[in-house]
Amino acid sequence: MKIFIVFELLDQPTGGGNQFLKMLRKGFDHKNCLTENPEDADVFLFNSHHFLKNVSSYKKSFPRAKFVHRIDGPMRLYNDLSDARDQQVYFANETFADATVYQSDWSKNKNLEMGLQPNQIHTTIQNCADNIIFYPLEKPKTNTKKIRLFSSSWSNHPKKGFDFYNYLDKNLDFNQYEYYFAGRSPVNFTNIKNLGPLSSDILATELRTSNIFITASQNDPCSNSLIEALSCGLTCVALKSGGHPEIIKNHDFLFETESEFIEILDKIKNNEIIQKNTIRNPLQVTEEYITFFEQILT
């Protein structure tokens, strides 16, 4: 079986889809399943609303191949209701896809509620991070004077949690905490140090020097930034929204209000709650994709 990924992968700081597909490409290559020539492909994997003209062309040229659609969203929930990309995804899934991969059950259910016509063949495969880059320290971090907090977001959309980060910037006790942010922010922080967009290698290093990762993104289907932080061994605290509860299975680390977050932070600081991370590795996720593709081909 040969797999062709319909996506232009970039080696620079960019969104989670690009990062995950780069990792998946390496996994397919390691398993000798990857092809760079569409003429050799048994399976075409395409992503969300990206490169649909290419997908349409390949579908016409290679009608015997199977086309698998990896879906996130709904984008109308984490962007705004005028976002037309969901309709492009739904059209592509109905027109081109022989099967669908959802990134979380939350994403699957919300897309179906908002108009996606279900594909008869589908599965849910959660994302993972590249463990060559995102891995924990061998020795636990020694105690420092301040607890190091970290957040990241490639997108600067307000629903990525910036109102909440702004609240923390103004209200946290920065005698106890230091706080770093990586990515693009619409907020000019006073106390939080904005590192800007970082390459994966540098981001992973920054994560490993931190203690607690915080995400307040709303309606995020399967947050790659959260998975990267967990993979680096951080204790992670997340807004109870989107696919976060499927990634952080211990609800002691999920919050809905500012006061709940502060309570969780205090419990972590006092060692009253301890998080045990259960993140899958790229080999497992790659094998899940390959097994699903093999089922489609039989």
Where are these regions (language model features)?
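A short, active-site helix/loop in glycosyltransferases that binds the activated sugar's phosphate group
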Residues: 95-120, 129
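Conserved donor-binding/catalytic core segment of Leloir-type glycosyltransferases
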Residues: 140-160, 166-170
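A charged, aromatic-enriched C-terminal amphipathic alpha-helix characteristic of glycosyltransferases
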Residues: 270-298
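Acidic anion/phosphate-binding donor-loop and adjacent secondary structure
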Residues: 79-80, 112, 127-145
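Short hydrophobic beta-strand element within catalytic cores of glycosyltransferases
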Residues: 235-238
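Membrane-proximal helix-turn-helix segments that form the acceptor-binding/catalytic region
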Residues: 83-100
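Aromatic "clamp/platform" in nucleotide-sugar-dependent glycosyltransferases that forms part
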Residues: 218
